[in-house]
Amino acid sequence: VEGYCADITRTYPISGKYSPRQKEIYDIVLRANRAVAEAARPGVTLRELNDLCKKVLAEGLTAIGKIQSADEIGRYYMHGVSHHLGLDTHDCAVREDLGLRAGMVISDEPGLYIDEEEIGIRIEDDLLITDEGCRVLSEAIPRTTEEIEALMAR
């Protein structure tokens, strides 16, 4: 809109249906995506959002027996959860230590990449920081496995 960028990702199953294992991994990533959106508000830093994301992803992978310790999350999650959006897709230098302010737009992009199972899942939304928290600008795009499978079945 008016020259500003967006950065949105969804992971769709090529067959139209997620396998049980793909759903399991997808749901972990979705929990991280939702946790970041819930936590994003003025004063919170990108570092805090990234730490939260890694915690949720590690808890999920530990619960399904994929990792034994949160220290292993780097094997399957090797990027940050957020960056600023603006006139460029990756707007301005990443300053993980600056508190967010109302009016900023950031990405929310957790992902898990499990090479040995040939599974890669990323869910990316754009968040507008508001005085009260944030507004998910990409809310209308199907996000859950059920919504995506229904869309693909049309």
Go through each PLM region and give its residues.
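Active-site neighborhoods and metal-handling regions in enzymes and metal-associated proteins
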Residues: 1-154
